[in-house]
C-alpha cells in the first residue's frame, strides 16, 4: 500500500516513515502543504497522513482542496491540537480519522 505522509517535523516524519515501512507500507514523504496537495492530486496513494500544521499551506486547506476535487483517498489528520472544535473541523472537512501527536505507530499502521 502506498501512503503519502505530509509532516514538516523531521524527527517525527522520519519516525512515522520508518514505522510504517516496517509494517510493509511504501511511504512518500513531503514536508509542506503545497507538495501534499500536488501529490494527492495525482491519485497515486491508497491513504494519506496529513499534519494540520504544515508550512506554505496548512493541512486543513490541503484536505478541503483534495475533497473539493472529489478525491476520496482516505486521509488521517495528524495534529498536536487535542480540542473538540479542531476534531470537528477536520472531520467536517473530510478527514477519515483524527490522530493526536504523539502517535502510536502500531495504531497508525492498523
PLM feature spans:
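N-terminal/domain-start alpha-helical segments
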Residues: 1-110
Amino acid at each position: 500500500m502506498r501512503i503519502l505522509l505530509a509532516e514538516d517535523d523531521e524527527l517525527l516524519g522520519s519516525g512515522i516513515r520508518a514505522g510504517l515501512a516496517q509494517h510493509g507500507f511504501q511511504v512518500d514523504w513531503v514536508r509542506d502543504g503545497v507538495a501534499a496537495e500536488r501529490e494527492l492530486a495525482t491519485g497515486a496513494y491508497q491513504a494519506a497522513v496529513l499534519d494540520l500544521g504544515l508550512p506554505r499551506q496548512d493541512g486543513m486547506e490541503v484536505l478541503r482542496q483534495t475533497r473539493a476535487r472529489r478525491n476520496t483517498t482516505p486521509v488521517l489528520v495528524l495534529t498536536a491540537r487535542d480540542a473538540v472544535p479542531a476534531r470537528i473541523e477536520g472531520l467536517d472537512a473530510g478527514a477519515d480519522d483524527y490522530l493526536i501527536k504523539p502517535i502510536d505507530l502500531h495504531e497508525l499502521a492498523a
